[in-house]
Amino acid sequence: MRVVIQRVSHASVTIDGHCKSAIQKGMMILVGIEETDSREDIDWLCKKIVNLRIFDDENGVMNKSILEDEGNILVISQFTLHASTKKGNRPSYIKAAKPEISIPLYEQFCKDLSCALGKEVKTGEFGADMKVELLNDGPVTICIDTKNKE
């Protein structure tokens, strides 16, 4: 699984002209799922996300997790995170999982992340054409890949 985490002042997702979900201060997370992802990837990633210290403490130092900061999370499915640009100029998405694999994993990820956060995680709609708006705070943007844990 690959995620791009952005610390935001606010974020929203619109589908067919209607706001599906919106959050105030917190994280907007793009998540891409590949064929080899599993429950273990979800477990590791959820723990990592809720404990990631990217929010400012009283001294302005990034030292607080989203749990401590009481922030919100908006999760958007994003198969293009698995784009390969190795050959030519047109990205290949061969590593992105097919819907029959990615939808259940995406739903489980959102459910488990809600449990880890202790409140509802807002989402987009899997496979929909979405318009995502956000105000990146910092900016702070973190990329995590469960197959390359750095």
UniProtKB/Swiss-Prot annotation:
* One BP term from GO: D-amino acid catabolic process
Annotated motif Gly-cisPro motif, important for rejection of L-amino acids, positions: 138-139
Q: Which UniProt keywords apply?
A: Cytoplasm, Hydrolase, RNA-binding, tRNA-binding
A GO cellular-component term linked to this record: cytoplasm
**Chief place where the protein resides:** cytoplasm
Specify whether Hydrolase is a keyword of the entry: yes
Record has Zinc as a keyword: no
Intracellular or extracellular location(s): Cytoplasm
EC numbers, comma separated:
3.1.1.96
Superkingdom of this protein's organism: Bacteria
Q: Name one GO molecular function term.
A: Gly-tRNA(Ala) deacylase activity
Which cysteine pairs make disulfide bonds? none
What CDD domains does its record include? Dtyr_deacylase (cd00563)
Q: Known SUPFAM superfamilies for this protein?
A: DTD-like
- Family the entry assigns: Belongs to the DTD family.
Xref: HAMAP family: Deacylase_Dtd
**PANTHER family the UniProt entry points to:** D-AMINOACYL-TRNA DEACYLASE 1, D-TYROSYL-TRNA TYR DEACYLASE
Per the entry, what this protein does is: An aminoacyl-tRNA editing enzyme that deacylates mischarged D-aminoacyl-tRNAs. Also deacylates mischarged glycyl-tRNA(Ala), protecting cells against glycine mischarging by AlaRS. Acts via tRNA-based rather than protein-based catalysis; rejects L-amino acids rather than detecting D-amino acids in the active site. By recycling D-aminoacyl-tRNA to D-amino acids and free tRNA molecules, this enzyme counteracts the toxicity associated with the formation of D-aminoacyl-tRNA entities in vivo and helps enforce protein L-homochirality.
Q: How does it assemble?
A: Homodimer.
What is the name of the protein in this document? Answer: D-aminoacyl-tRNA deacylase
- The species is Bacteroides fragilis (strain YCH46)
Gene that this sequence comes from: dtd
